[in-house]
Amino acid sequence: MAPTQRKVLHRGRAAAGVRALLRAACLLGIAASGAAPISATAAELRLPDGIVTHADGRLPLQQLAASWLRLVDAGWQLDLIAESKPPGTTTALPIVALRSPTPGAAVWILTGIHGEEPAGPNAVAAAIDDLAALGDTLPVVLLPLLNPHGYARNWRYLDLPTFSDTADGHSVGDSSHLLPDPAEPGRPRAGAASSPEADAVTRYVVRTSAAYPPLISIDLHEDDLVTAGYVYSQGELGTSDPLAQAAVAVLREHGIAIQLDGQTRFGETIVGGIIGPVTDSSIDELIGATSILVDGRAQAGPSAHTVLVFETPAKELPLDRRVAAHLTLLRRLAGLLAARPEL
């Protein structure tokens, strides 16, 4: 996590088959924040022909999308948030979300904000059946790949390939245009969204929170500049959140090094492997915010009780181990939430 910027289809099927299978009963329009979803009959989401995914062992985009279809088959709603076409790209790729059939206080799961962090999207694909089962017990909103072009070309941001101390990359999760300025709460931190993608994603979060208010949010990240990970807890309980503590235990049990104290490389204090709420203008801060500014007007924010961001070390671990750690984390948390939804 950096200040301000944290830091379709079954296997082997042809592209034509991919496009024919990836269908949504409802296409979510990108209108004003408070607008209702716009329906379209049998709207089709397409992955363009010829999309090549960075070859480091991560699943191709087509295989990720194949896993999402299993949720659609289980009755989940597939929403098109935006068609992403960042600078330097020639084709648009869909940013999608999936919602379990029954609305209500929900578990939100996000991944793929940073394109050079593939473990989360791959773990979500492997955990689809577990997430489907969780959706039978609790409302769930899944944003499985928020930066598809970044994933395909191994770029962290929409406009920069790597984190930089001297340049602010445009993250798809930038929320500064909706979050109050701490020094002047009546004004947002930025006058406009940093990109069309950030605008669309944050509008989706605000709008969807009406029917699926986030109770618990889980955001999967990696950091290739550290050898020990940690968990951000942006919610009400901070470092005392029992889910954050359980997550630290799961990661340690799985052999993932966790920094238990000291500070992150951004100067944030770590207590038991957990960092309490920070002001970073991320989508996670937005999901936990009790008050936001939309079109210049203050309104209640999504107000999630628990907002967890997992930063696992990528520097010295092969991808398969990183995916396995994220998969174990998802399965354990899904099982815990299904058994004890009061958490």
Labelled PLM ranges:
Residues 1, 8, 17, 21-22, ...:
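C-terminal accessory segments enriched in acidic
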Residues 22-34:
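Bacterial N-terminal signal peptides
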Residues 104, 118-127, 132-249:
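Active-site/substrate-binding loop(s) of hydrolase catalytic cores
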Residues 95-103:
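Short beta-strand-to-loop junctions in surface cap/lid or active-site-entrance loops
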Residues 106-111:
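Short beta-strand element of the alpha/beta-hydrolase
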